[in-house]
A protein has these predicted regions:
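Glyoxalase I/VOC metalloenzyme domain signal
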Residues: 1-92
Length: 92
C-alpha cells in the first residue's frame, strides 16, 4: 500500500487571514497540523498554506527583516498568523 510523506507536498497561496483560515480548516479536518504553516490532510498528503503577504515581505530586500520573518516561520506550529509574521518582519 502506498502512503504519502513529506517528499511530496502541495502549496496553496492565499490572500489574507480569512482565506488562510478557510482553506486551512477545510484541509486539516481529519488530518494534523505541522510546523511552519504545513498540515497533513486526512489522506496523509502534506500541504503548505502560504499567505501572499509572506512573499511580499520577503521580496523587499532587507536581510535582517527576512531573518526575523524566517525565525517566526520556524517557530510556527500550525497555520500562519499574518499579523504575527508582519510584526516579526518589522521587529515589533
Amino acid at each position: 500500500q502506498f502512503t504519502f510523506n513529506e517528499a511530496i507536498s502541495l502549496e496553496v497561496r492565499v490572500s489574507g487571514q480569512e482565506q488562510l483560515d478557510q482553506v486551512w480548516a477545510a484541509l486539516v479536518e481529519g488530518g494534523e497540523e505541522l510546523p511552519c504553516g504545513w498540515l497533513k490532510d486526512k489522506y496523509g498528503l502534506a500541504w503548505q498554506i502560504t499567505p501572499t503577504e509572506y512573499y511580499d515581505l520577503l521580496g523587499k530586500g532587507d536581510p535582517e527583516a527576512d531573518s526575523r520573518l524566517m525565525s517566526a516561520v520556524l517557530k510556527t506550529i500550525g497555520k500562519f498568523n499574518i499579523a504575527e509574521l508582519q510584526a516579526a518582519y518589522k521587529g515589533s
